[in-house]
Amino acid sequence: MNRISTTTITTITITTGNGAG
């Protein structure tokens, strides 16, 4: 569960950074 959460957060961060950039 913790691993999935980390992956999700990472994906969201990348997506947000990509969209913001």
From Swiss-Prot:
Keywords: Amino-acid biosynthesis, Leader peptide, Threonine biosynthesis. It comes from the Bacteria. One of its GO terms (biological process) is threonine biosynthetic process. InterPro entries: Thr_lead_pept. The keyword Amino-acid biosynthesis applies. This protein is involved in control of the biosynthesis of threonine. Belongs to the thr operon leader peptide family. This is thr operon leader peptide. It comes from Salmonella typhimurium (strain LT2 / SGSC1412 / ATCC 700720). The lineage of its organism: Bacteria, Pseudomonadati, Pseudomonadota, Gammaproteobacteria, Enterobacterales.
